[in-house]
């Protein structure tokens, strides 16, 4: 939450930059929709941005890659209860071309999947950085424990 009666996007951007300051961030991958405040703050801080739309053609490969990392025991979330809850709120949507993306399950649309969506976004950025799926990322979830085979 932010102080006041409305969401303070500059406050949120400032908090994000404070967290990112604890890590060696080379680039931030963001959804361009409604990102003006974040984009401005990150540019001022000198953090390069890679914008990509949250559509199935962009999200299919990183969703498949995150699934591969989890099922292959190459990545886990350290039994984080919030991420466990968010995973339980996810379903996989598949289009007629076999592209996939995560969606909220229909049982309760109010439940959150933001942490899982952020993980897919991070995998997208990681794949862009190494230019191919496969392997094991150094880290893409704060506090996550990565297991290498």
PLM-predicted stretches and their roles:
Residues 58-66:
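Short, charged, surface-exposed secondary-structure boundary motifs
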Residues 1-54, 64, 77-149:
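RNase H-like, metal-dependent nuclease domains and their acidic two-metal-ion catalytic environment used
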